[in-house]
Amino acid sequence: MRKRSWLTSAISLLILVVLSCSPQGNNLSIQVWFSPGGGCTDAIVGELNKAKKEILVQAYSFTSQPIAKALVDAHKRGVRIEIILDKSRRTEKYSAADFTSHMGVSTYIDGAHAIAHNKIMIIDNETVITGSFNFTKAAEERNAENLLIIRSKQLAKDYLDNWEKHKAHSEKYIGR
């Protein structure tokens, strides 16, 4: 009960911070999803399928086949995709890094930190997907996770600035 209360408080605080930082007319929209079994993966895939220009990803663990396939499908539609992953993905047995890089998606490894623990997507410079949800089957089916889909150009810009800092020190992943 305490953990749930803490999680609810943390999410509420995040929403208040986002709302207070948003300029008027930013057309802020927030959707929240929970797992297990709450449709987080489907929500992410739905957003990826709507992308028109660009999807930027930072992920710690990334083994979800539906999400990897949606990214590759977007790449085939001409959407620019770039993925930054934690250094542990080089050796993870079921990492999507090999699949995405072999399919032509620009994939990078961030080895500059003890753990590159971000879980974000920036879509078309206006939508941010973030939360505790790792892009994995376990996160969808077994773990207690949360996911936010936030439509805000200003927030997307803030996340983009941070994403670019991480890309600057990341190395291109060419697969195994």
Regions found by a protein language model. Name each.
Residues 44-106:
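Primarily the HKD phosphodiesterase
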Residues 127-176:
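Signature of lipid phosphatidyltransferase scaffolds
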Residues 49, 100-101, 113-116, 121-124, ...:
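Extracellular/periplasmic catalytic domains that process cell-envelope and extracellular macromolecules
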Residues 25-39:
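Boundary/entry segment of secreted carbohydrate-active catalytic domains
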Residues 1-5:
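Positively charged n-region of N-terminal signal peptides that target proteins for export
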Residues 61-65, 87-91, 113-116, 127-128, ...:
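Solvent-exposed loop/turn segments at secondary-structure junctions
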Residues 56-58, 82-85, 108-109, 121-122, ...:
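Structural recognition of the beta-strand scaffold that forms the well-ordered cores
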Residues 8-28:
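Bacterial Sec-dependent signal peptides at the C-terminal "C-region" and cleavage site
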